Amino acid sequence: MASMFAEREVLVMLDDNCIFCKIAAGEIPSETVYEDEQFRAILDLGPASAGHTLILPKAHFKDVTEISDEYAANVLKVAAKLGKAMKKGLGCEGFNLVQNNGEAAGQTVMHFHMHVIPRYAGGEDMVSWDPKPAKREELEKQGAKLREALED
């Protein structure tokens, strides 16, 4: 499938002040483990575990609400490739896909990116929460609000 963005258009979409745009464009050195026409995947400088990788689109999207359908579909294909490579090359037993949107959610660089984090036996538990039972009435209210918002 042809890219919906011509190369010239993608370059226009880069944010001159965005460090991830510069890394994705190859202007700042990084340990690149994968690259194609849409993405560059690099090892994280502050890894949660050995092999922690960031998938960076070469086009600038602030977060998942701005990413195009084509990029959204293809980022999961890249994540799957990386996950398989992590199992084969690094011997991890699993991996987490983490994608934060907005400061309140922990996004520190306002350029869409996905973390692929290898998980090893006996490794630190990093993705967890304390589930609390939900009340049926609250679920119904939240569900109605979300369905209404999805119709807009």
What residue spans do the PLM features occupy?
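HIT superfamily nucleotide-processing domains
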Residues: 2-152
